[in-house]
Amino acid sequence: MSDKPDMAEIEKFDKSKLKKTETQEKNPLPSKETIEQEKQAGES
């Protein structure tokens, strides 16, 4: 196996076979309020 991708393989790749997927955020960032509450809980 070489590190470089096989250009012939890339050229014959059919993009239409790819399915469109809806991106779902799995790890939404906590809100500022949540962060502040956790900070205060950790300090007490």
From Swiss-Prot:
GO terms for molecular function: actin monomer binding; enzyme binding; protein sequestering activity; RNA binding. Pfam families: Thymosin (PF01290). There is a cross-link at residue 12 (Glycyl lysine isopeptide (Lys-Gly) (interchain with G-Cter in SUMO2)). CDD domains: WH2_BetaT. Keywords: Acetylation, Actin-binding, Cytoplasm, Cytoskeleton, Isopeptide bond, Phosphoprotein, Ubl conjugation. The modification N-acetylserine is found at residue 2. Plays an important role in the organization of the cytoskeleton. Binds to and sequesters actin monomers (G actin) and therefore inhibits actin polymerization. This is Thymosin beta-4. It comes from Homo sapiens (Human).
